[in-house]
Each structure stands twice: as structure tokens, then as C-alpha cells.
């Protein structure tokens, strides 16, 4: 058990991660994420939202221990995962699972559903023979809505639709009874009519087993649905720009980037979407990570840009009201 | 309203090792001059295949039109049967009458040619009688229309432009020979929200300024909500419902459309738990008998499992392919 009641399940403390890019003559270090803070407890949900290249996937990989941060700490139940013993790290990896975007490439095409799902069970000693494995897998398949399970067990990925594959992938994620699932765009390649069912399934598992989620997406609308009363974190070019309760941010976005994003988002309702007023950007171009803007990273595009301040000083994330943090000079900092 | 395109009883099949994939099945649809028609459907619904067929761009040897025709109505009153066009005429037809922009089209720009030369080549290669100066004037006008800085873009190579800029170059390029109809297949799908919004606005400008007819193919109902005049919903290769944007969004008359609308989350309005459509899309090789949606439909009766419904008139401009729409949704 954790050290105390209040020890979060997972914590990221001031995490930095840089990649080396460029040719063999001139390698440049690019900060993929900078100073990321995140904390979540049992049955908590946090949605990480941002456009491509904002560092949300890197943050996810750091959180599950697939990437080692250059600076900062990743704590699981209060313990730095990079200072764990082999045994502890193995337990951490079993309890914190990653779910990927592409159900077409995340399943081995040569393996039946049974083979895919039984391998981790045997590896982690959760089943000792075929009979036990079949029983457990049948329960998992029923849980994710693939019935009759006996029929699905013998199928290969190519015999399944995208929605079915994502359910198999989800069953695999669940097979080791994880405490936390980092789901990276789990529904973006799934058909619209099946998305809701996958998201609902994930939410059901939270109800049933108190699973926590880090939901990574570019799609604010599904993020809103998934983490309404929970947390939302908006990222831009590797930094957190705004964080707080999802519904409150959607209702009243504080950071100019969040405001622009919400104003640009099309919605599946003609009257609503056609009456939206777009907040115009100063520039449409996303700056290159190789030439990160000085001061606030959003300043070259920000409609509220103040010369001499925003292009000089990087805003820090400050708490503007209880539970809401924003990194913008409009709100002090 | 005058149609610019009439699709009559069109069916297309792909040959696969497992059997014939019935990608498009008996599609009947008129596209009216000056409208923005959205073809909305999920993967495998046949919307992209339908789009390709309209330009006779189906991969030869693999795909086959097994029935029906596509008639293009020219401004001068003449009619063209697109599927019967031969190479030379087809080539001219493709840029001058109908043009197409694909998802990821920006990747089809030649990486070692400046935008300027690629755009000029389109004009030159199609034998348009314009002086070099007139041609560049036209190119600059179109780049301005898609909100690009012509001076900068023209002398750039594709790698110097962002994805959104390249996609706008492709849109400008598709307009070079003044087509009357533009087909857009998921033109914004791989792009970020802000870039996507910009392209949607560009398309609005084009509609307002050039009065072009557009067919926009997408899986994204939000984009249809934003730009469509009319929407055709596709399922398992057929059009299951067609109507105005208002009719489809606020008074749907097909259980699939209805289910689809209830399964997408919204941002501003209050919502409870989303309901998704039960089951999975059908296998396009072994389609179920009767209505292709019946295995997933909560309203099905015996007739739905026996006979495939055809499009029936609900009200002016609004058609649904459901035997039971009156019982389920009531009359307007």
C-alpha cells in the first residue's frame, strides 16, 4: 500500500524530455516536453489535449516508464520509478498499462485472440494452464463486449473489424488488472458509431475496478465526454498552458490558446457550429520546435500579444482559482 | 434546381481473394448546381469509392463498375456519360469540368519542383491558351483566395510549407482550369483543428466567390454541420438517407442516421451518456439479406430482414431507405 491515504497513484514532477534531431553533422536538442506536472489518484481521470507535436504522447510514454525523463521525477505510489528495484519496476509496469491508437498495428497479425491475450497471463503468472487462461480470457472478452467469447478466441486480427480489434487491445490492457491506463488516442481510428461504446466501456471499468486513466487526445470533444468532472490539461509546444476541471475549462477557457481552440472546433450541430465566432490568430503557422519562440511559446500567434512582455518573459503556471492553473501573462504570473 | 451530376443505379465491386466486395450498391443521387453536398459515412461505407467513380479514377483490374451510369450535365446543355469517356476527353474533363482534392493530397506535390512551376505546368499541360503573364496572374489570384501569401509560396518547395499550406496549394491548383464541380475527399482529416478550420473557411470563400458545386466526402458529422447544404448518409455501400442539413440533423428519418447523431459527443450542449449503435458494420463480402442495417437496428421487424428498402420520400428533398420510418419517427 502507499505511504499514506494522500499519496497519489502517479505523479509527474517537473518532467523534461528532449529528443536529438537533425543530420549527423549538426544534431540539435529539441525539448519535447518541459516542466510537466501531473498528479492522479485512484479512479481519477486526466485528459491531455493538444495538437500534433505538443508533447502529449511523450508525456504519456514518460508516465508509463517507456521513456526516462532528462529531468524531473515520475513517482508511482510515492516512489521514483527510476530508482525502483527490478521487482518493484515490474510491478509498476504491470499496474500501469498503455493503450495505443492503432488497433491495426498493435495486435500481432500472426496470433489468434487467445494467443494474444494468454501470453501476458502466463508471463505474469495469472494463469497456469490453458483451462485457466481460457476461463479468464472468456471473462475478459465478455467484459469488453465480444460475445460469444469462444468464437472470438480463435479469430485472427484480420478477421476482426477496427472496433473489435480495439476491444481486443483493451482486453489485453485489462488482463493484468492495471491500476492506471494511459490511453493514447484510443478512439481516433475507430468509426464514429463505435467510439462512444469504447469510451463508455473504459468508463465502466473505472466504475467497476477503480481504474485511473490518462486520456491522450487531440479531440477536445471526446476529452470533455471522458473527463467531465475530472481534470483536463491543455498542452502547447511541450508545455502545460492550462489545467483544471474539464467542464469548467470548456465553459470558461482562460488561456488564449484554449479560447482559440474552442472557438475553432466544429460541432455536430449546424445551428451551434454556424453561430460560433472564431477568435482569429495572429499567425496560422505553428512555430518549429527547432526554433522555439522566446518568452511565451504562443506569443507569435496569440491574439492578445503584448510586446515587450510576452515575447520576453516565459509565463509560469499559476493557480488563478482553486484547482485551475494557467500559464499566461493576462493572469499575472 | 438544375442537376450538374446525375448518378443512376451505380454499383461498384472490388475483387478480393475472399470474394467480391460490394463497395457501392445501387446509388441514385442528383447533385445540384451550386450546392455543397456532403457524403457522410463510416469506413467501408463506400463513400470514397463513389467519389473515385465520379471521375472514373477507380483502380483498373481491381474495381469494376457493375451497373449504372454517371451523367455530367454541361453548362451548354450537353450531357456526358462519364464512365464511357476515353482517355483524351477524360483528361480534359478531369481538370476543366470536375476536379478532386484527396486526403493527404499535399503529399502528391512534387518535392523537387517549386510550387510556381508545378502550378504553371497544370495550365500549360492542359493546353489552356493563356500567356505566361496571364497564367501567373491567375495562379496568384487563386493562392490569395485560399489565403496564402503568393509571393512566399510560389518560390517555395513543398517541404518549406506546412501541411495546411500544402493542402491549400492543392485546392488552389484544383481550381486552375475553372472546374464547375469540386470533389473533396476528407481534405482536412490529417490536419490540426486550427488548420482544419482555416481550410473550411477557405472552402466557404470559394463557394461564395466562385459559386462552385462541391461534393465533400467525410466521416465527420461536425464538418457537415458546418458547411453542408445537403447531406447523403451512406451505409454498407448505399445511400440510406438524404436531405438538407436541417432535415438530417434535426429530423433524421433513418435509424442509422439517428443512432450516429446520438453517438457523437457535443461540446457546448448538455449531454448524458452517449448511446452507441450496437454491433459492428457488416462484412462487405457477405452482406446480410434485407436492410443492411437490420442486424444493428433496434427497430427491425420481419420485413427488414427480407427485403432491402429503397429511398422513399419523407418530404420535399428528404428521402430515407427505411421500411418503418413512419412508425419510428412519425410524419413531418
What do the PLM-derived regions correspond to, one by one?
Chain A
Residues 1-252, 263, 326, 331-333:
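ABC transporter nucleotide-binding domains
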Residues 8, 245-333:
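Charged, flexible cofactor/metal-binding loops and thiol motifs
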Amino acid at each position: 500500500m502507499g505511504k499514506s491515504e494522500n499519496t497519489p497513484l502517479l505523479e509527474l514532477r517537473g518532467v523534461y524530455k528532449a529528443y536529438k534531431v537533425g543530420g549527423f553533422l549538426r544534431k540539435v536538442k529539441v525539448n519535447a516536453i518541459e516542466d510537466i506536472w501531473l498528479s492522479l489518484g485512484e479512479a481519477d481521470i486526466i485528459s491531455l489535449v493538444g495538437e500534433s507535436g505538443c508533447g502529449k504522447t511523450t508525456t504519456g510514454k514518460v508516465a508509463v516508464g517507456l521513456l526516462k525523463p532528462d529531468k524531473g521525477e515520475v513517482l508511482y505510489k510515492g516512489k521514483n520509478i527510476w530508482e525502483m528495484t527490478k521487482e518493484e519496476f515490474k510491478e509498476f509496469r504491470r499496474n500501469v498499462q498503455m493503450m495505443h491508437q492503432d488497433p491495426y498495428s498493435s495486435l500481432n497479425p500472426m496470433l489468434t485472440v487467445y494467443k494474444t491475450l494468454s501470453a501476458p497471463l502466463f508471463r505474469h503468472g495469472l494463469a497456469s494452464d490453458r483451462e485457466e487462461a481460457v476461463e479468464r480470457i472468456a471473462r475478459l472478452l465478455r467484459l469488453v463486449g465480444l460475445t460469444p467469447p469462444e468464437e472470438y478466441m480463435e479469430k485472427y486480427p484480420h478477421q476482426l473489424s477496427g472496433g473489435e480489434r480495439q476491444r481486443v487491445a483493451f482486453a489485453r490492457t485489462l488482463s493484468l488488472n492495471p491500476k492506471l491506463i494511459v490511453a493514447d488516442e484510443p478512439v481516433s481510428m475507430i468509426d464514429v458509431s463505435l467510439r462512444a461504446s469504447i469510451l463508455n466501456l473504459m468508463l465502466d471499468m473505472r466504475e467497476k475496478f477503480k481504474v485511473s486513466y490518462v486520456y491522450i487526445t487531440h479531440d477536445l470533444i471526446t476529452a470533455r465526454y471522458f473527463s467531465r468532472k475530472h481534470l483536463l490539461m491543455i498542452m502547447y509546444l511541450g508545455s502545460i498552458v492550462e489545467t483544471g476541471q474539464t467542464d469548467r475549462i470548456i465553459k470558461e477557457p482562460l488561456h488564449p490558446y484554449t479560447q482559440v481552440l474552442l472557438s475553432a472546433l466544429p460541432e455536430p450541430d449546424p445551428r451551434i457550429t454556424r453561430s460560433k465566432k472564431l477568435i482569429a490568430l495572429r499567425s496560422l503557422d505553428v512555430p518549429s520546435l527547432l526554433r522555439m519562440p522566446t518568452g511565451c511559446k504562443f506569443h507569435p500567434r496569440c491574439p492578445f500579444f503584448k510586446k515587450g512582455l510576452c515575447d520576453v518573459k516565459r509565463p509560469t503556471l499559476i493557480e488563478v482559482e482553486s484547482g485551475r492553473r494557467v500559464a499566461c501573462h493576462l493572469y499575472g504570473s | 434546381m438544375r442537376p450538374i451530376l446525375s448518378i443512376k443505379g451505380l454499383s461498384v465491386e472490388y475483387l478480393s481473394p475472399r470474394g467480391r466486395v460490394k463497395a457501392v450498391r445501387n446509388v441514385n443521387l442528383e447533385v445540384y448546381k451550386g450546392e455543397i453536398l456532403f457524403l457522410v459515412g463510416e469506413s467501408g461505407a463506400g463513400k470514397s469509392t463513389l467519389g473515385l467513380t465520379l471521375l472514373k479514377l477507380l483502380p483498373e483490374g481491381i474495381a469494376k463498375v457493375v451497373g449504372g451510369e454517371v451523367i455530367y450535365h454541361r453548362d451548354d446543355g450537353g450531357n456526358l456519360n462519364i464512365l464511357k469517356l476515353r482517355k483524351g476527353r477524360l483528361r480534359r474533363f478531369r481538370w476543366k469540368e470536375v476536379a478532386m482534392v484527396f486526403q493527404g493530397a499535399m503529399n502528391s506535390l512534387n518535392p523537387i519542383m517549386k510550387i510556381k512551376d508545378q502550378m504553371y505546368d497544370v495550365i500549360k499541360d492542359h493546353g489552356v491558351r493563356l500567356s505566361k503573364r496571364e497564367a501567373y496572374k491567375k495562379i496568384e489570384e487563386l493562392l490569395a483566395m485560399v489565403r496564402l501569401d503568393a509571393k512566399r509560396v510560389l518560390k517555395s518547395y513543398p517541404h518549406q510549407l506546412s501541411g495546411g499550406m500544402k493542402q491549400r496549394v492543392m485546392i488552389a491548383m484544383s481550381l486552375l482550369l475553372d472546374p464547375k464541380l469540386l470533389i473533396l475527399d476528407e481534405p482536412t482529416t490529417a490536419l490540426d483543428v486550427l488548420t482544419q478550420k482555416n481550410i473550411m473557411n477557405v472552402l466557404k470563400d470559394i463557394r461564395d466567390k466562385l459559386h462552385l458545386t462541391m461534393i465533400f466526402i467525410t466521416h465527420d458529422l461536425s464538418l457537415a454541420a458546418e458547411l453542408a447544404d445537403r447531406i447523403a448518409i451512406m451505409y454498407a455501400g448505399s445511400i440510406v438517407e438524404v436531405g438538407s442539413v436541417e432535415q438530417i440533423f434535426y429530423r433524421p428519418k433513418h435509424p442509422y442516421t439517428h443512432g450516429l447523431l446520438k453517438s457523437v459527443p457535443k461540446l457546448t450542449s448538455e449531454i448524458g451518456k452517449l448511446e452507441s449503435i450496437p454491433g459492428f458494420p457488416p462484412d462487405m463480402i457477405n452482406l446480410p439479406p434485407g436492410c443492411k442495417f437490420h442486424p444493428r437496428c433496434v427497430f427491425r421487424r420481419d420485413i427488414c430482414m427480407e427485403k432491402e428498402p429503397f429511398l422513399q420520400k419523407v418530404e420535399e428533398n428528404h428521402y430515407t431507405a427505411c421500411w418503418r420510418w413512419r412508425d419510428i419517427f412519425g410524419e413531418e
